[in-house]
């Protein structure tokens, strides 16, 4: 519709835009959003045909101005996260030395490690005195990472880790979350793919039922479910999302790891899976929180007065973004910052600094604020967090951003040394 309309009074248009700019500057984005929503409602009430859409710009939902500082000692958390990453990879690599047929997945947890660690350190409540705690549906393919953290905590032994996927003698660990095989460890089974999201919706609904019938106190408990962007194509994954909003399941949080890759290649090579999922969930009545860009992009976005960087972020497809992260900083400078104006934006940055521009799902500050938004909203809706990451993060040539990442069971010596140095592992 907008392509058929013409600006018959540019001066009046500028006055409206200046007024909105003033509201943003002096009263903030929430006030501006309220005014725009009021205008849209008023226009519809008057019978004006309005453009409609359920997606927002390809940017983080939580603005820099609205961010809270992440509590705790981030240096300590970074070190713990690095050790967990290393041990998660080592579990699969050691099993592979015995027999490659044992399998296992390295790349999935490496892409999601920050999201799990922020949850463990700052949000998830365990069962304790007078409290039943939160419920977490872990994505099936990240099991080695959860085992690795449990080892650091002293909950699992090295002997158990060495017997990953070797359970015949009773000392091993199952491939995936499996409460029957490891009842004191896992809360829910989440494989095959798609079962976790579906079960989590009905689990959250059951908690509401128990509270409303006076059978149990479940207020304050959250149901968290982690899944992959490729997993969302399973019919079960999105099959009941309308029920979740209809039932007002504000105790439910989906965290979708959008690393842009599935079992056998790109999820949406010629599209944008985050935008697609945002449309699906927003249309079904969910709160949507997008975590796309890490803090190292903040300075560039602040410099982007004319919106050329935002436009470039919007027009690039997932296949492009995956390609960038399988190359290097020089390639990103040439192909992402592909106009004189964009190149000028990063003229003061080295190729290494461009390469270090991080994605939101790998930035604990951005992840923390997304989780905080999810647990503190009070509008009676479930929340989905769409976090952009890199499949095989840290694996280098053995898998980072590669189509083969999901099936990677081993890493060559050079990649392993690079992994060690990147995360400063003392081995």
Segments from the language model and where they lie:
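Short, glycine-/Ser/Thr-/acidic-enriched flexible segments
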Residues: 30, 141-143, 151-154, 204-205, ...
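Cofactor-binding active-site loop characterized by glycine-rich and histidine/acidic residues
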Residues: 72-84, 88-98, 105-247, 270-271
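Long, well-ordered, tryptophan-enriched scaffold segments
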Residues: 258-427
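Extended, charge-enriched "interface" segments that sit outside catalytic cores
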Residues: 52, 63-67
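Short internal beta-strands
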Residues: 136-139, 251-259
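Hydrophobic alpha-helical scaffolding
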Residues: 6-10, 25, 29, 70, ...
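Amphipathic alpha-helical packing elements
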Residues: 9-45, 49
């Amino acid at each position: 519709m907008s392509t058929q309309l013409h600006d018959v009074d540019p001066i009046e248009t500028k006055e409206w835009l200046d007024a909105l700019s003033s509201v943003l500057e002096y009263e903030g984005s929430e006030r501006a959003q309220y005014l725009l929503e009021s205008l849209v409602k008023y226009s519809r009430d008057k019978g004006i045909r309005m453009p409609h859409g359920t997606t927002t710009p390809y940017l983080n939902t939580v603005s820099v101005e609205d961010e809270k500082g992440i509590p705790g000692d981030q240096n300590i958390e970074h070190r713990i996260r690095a050790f967990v990453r290393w041990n998660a990879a080592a579990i699969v690599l050691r099993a592979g030395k015995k027999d490659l047929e044992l399998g296992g997945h390295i790349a999935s947890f490496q892409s999601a490690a920050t999201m799990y660690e922020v949850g463990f350190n700052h949000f998830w409540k365990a069962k304790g005195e007078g409290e039943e705690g939160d419920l977490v549906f872990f994505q099936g393919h990240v099991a080695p990472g959860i085992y690795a953290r449990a080892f650091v905590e002293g909950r699992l032994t090295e002997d158990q880790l060495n017997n990953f996927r070797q359970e015949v003698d009773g000392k091993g660990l199952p491939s995936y979350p499996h409460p029957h095989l490891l009842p004191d460890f896992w809360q829910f089974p989440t494989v095959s793919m798609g079962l976790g999201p579906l079960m989590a919706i009905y689990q959250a609904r059951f908690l509401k039922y128990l509270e409303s019938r006076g059978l149990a106190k479940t207020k304050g408990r959250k149901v968290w479910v982690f899944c992959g962007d490729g997993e969302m194509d399973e019919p079960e994954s999105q099959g009941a999302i309308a029920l979740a909003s209809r039932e007002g399941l504000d105790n439910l949080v989906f965290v979708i790891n959008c690393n842009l890759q599935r079992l056998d290649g790109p999820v949406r090579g010629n599209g944008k899976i985050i935008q697609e999922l945002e449309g699906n969930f927003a249309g079904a009545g969910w709160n949507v929180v997008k975590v796309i860009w890490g803090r190292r992009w903040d300075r560039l976005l602040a410099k982007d007065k004319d919106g050329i960087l935002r436009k470039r972020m919007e027009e690039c497809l997932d296949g492009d973004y995956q390609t960038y992260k399988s190359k290097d900083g020089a390639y990103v400078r040439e192909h992402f910052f592909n106009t004189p104006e964009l190149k000028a934006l990063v003229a003061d940055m080295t190729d290494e600094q461009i390469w270090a521009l991080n994605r939101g799902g790998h930035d604990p500050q951005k992840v923390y604020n997304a989780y905080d938004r999810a647990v503190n909203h009070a509008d009676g809706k479930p929340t989905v967090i769409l976090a952009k990451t890199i499949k095989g993060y840290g694996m280098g040539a053995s898998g980072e951003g590669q189509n083969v990442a999901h099936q990677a069971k081993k890493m060559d010596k050079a990649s392993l040394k690079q992994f060690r140095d990147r995360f400063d592992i003392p081995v």
